[in-house]
C-alpha cells in the first residue's frame, strides 16, 4: 500500500530480533529453520555475536536474526497516508465515533456508536487492548498491559555512525522486552518497561532510561525529550 498509494512515512527495511541468552539464540535458530521449511520464508539471516554487535552497536546480545522482509515506519504518517488514499477512493470515515456495541443479526453486523450506526456484511475488529465490552470472545483471551517509550534528543553524527548504522529496528528477548529504532530525525525511540497503569511517573521515566543505558551506555548523557505510554494486548 505504501508503494501503491505513494505514502511518505519514513519506511525503512530490516528488523533484528536480538537474543539476551544462548538459549534464546537457539530458539531463534529453530524458529528460523521452521519458517524456511514451512513457509519458504528466506529473508531471515542468522547473526552471530560479532555481527549483531556491529549491526546494533551494543555488546549486550549473544546473537540474533535479521529479518530483511520486516522494517519500521512512522505510524502517524502511515495512518494519515491511508486516510488520504481512502478518501480518494470515496471511503467514508467517521472519526470521534465511540463504538458502544456490536450486534450480529441474521443479515448483517450492526456497529452502534455514540453518534449513529453502521451496517455491514462483515467487520474487522481491530481494537487490540481497547476492546472492553465489545467482543467477549476476544476480550477473555487477551491481557491488556501498558508499555512506555522514551525519545531522546537527536544523536550526534559520531553516535549515528556507531548505533544502528543500517537503520534497522530491534526487539529483544527480555521478559519486559526492549524495542527501539532511530527516528528519521536520528532520535533514539526506546520502548519497554511493561506495567499495568498508564500514569506516567518520574520513576517510570528513570526505569525506561535505565534500560536504554543498559543497552547503550554511550547514550547515558543524552537528554530525554519525550515520554509516552499506551496499552497493548
Model-derived segments and spans:
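Active-site substrate-recognition segment that forms the wall
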Residues: 1-12, 99-101, 106, 116-233
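A generic structural signal for alpha->beta connector loops
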Residues: 6, 40-43, 90, 108, ...
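Preference for short coil/turn "hinge" residues that link or interrupt alpha-helices
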Residues: 37-40, 66, 86, 92, ...
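General small-molecule cofactor/ligand-binding pocket signal
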Residues: 10, 44-47, 92-94, 223-227
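Flavin (FAD/FMN) cofactor-binding and adjacent substrate-gating region
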Residues: 3-81
Amino acid at each position: 500500500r505504501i508503494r501503491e498509494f505513494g505514502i511518505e512515512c519514513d519506511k525503512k527495511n530490516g528488523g533484528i530480533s536480538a537474543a539476551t541468552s544462548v538459549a534464546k539464540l537457539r530458539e531463534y535458530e529453530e524458529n528460523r529453520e521452521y519458517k524456511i521449511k514451512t513457509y519458504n520464508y528466506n529473508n531471515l539471516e542468522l547473526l552471530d555475536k560479532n555481527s549483531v554487535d556491529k549491526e546494533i552497536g551494543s555488546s549486550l546480545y549473544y546473537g540474533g536474526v535479521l529479518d530483511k522482509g520486516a522494517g519500521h515506519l512512522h505510524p502517524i504518517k502511515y495512518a494519515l497516508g491511508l486516510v488520504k488514499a481512502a478518501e480518494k477512493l470515496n471511503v467514508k470515515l467517521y472519526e470521534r465515533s465511540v463504538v458502544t456495541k456490536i450486534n450480529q443479526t441474521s443479515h448483517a453486523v450492526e456497529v452502534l456508536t455514540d453518534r449513529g450506526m453502521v451496517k455491514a456484511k462483515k467487520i474487522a475488529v481491530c481494537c487490540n487492548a481497547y476492546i472492553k465490552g465489545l467482543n467477549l470472545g476476544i476480550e477473555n483471551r487477551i491481557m491488556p498491559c501498558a508499555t512506555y517509550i522514551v525519545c531522546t534528543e537527536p544523536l550526534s553524527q559520531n553516535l549515528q555512525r556507531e548505533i544502528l548504522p543500517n537503520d534497522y529496528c530491534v526487539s529483544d528477548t527480555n521478559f519486559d522486552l526492549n524495542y527501539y529504532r532511530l527516528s528519521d530525525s536520528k532520535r533514539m525511540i526506546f520502548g519497554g518497561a511493561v506495567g499495568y497503569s498508564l500514569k506516567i511517573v518520574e520513576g517510570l521515566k528513570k526505569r525506561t532510561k535505565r534500560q536504554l543505558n543498559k543497552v547503550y551506555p554511550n547514550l547515558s548523557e543524552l537528554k530525554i525529550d519525550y515520554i509516552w505510554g499506551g496499552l497493548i494486548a
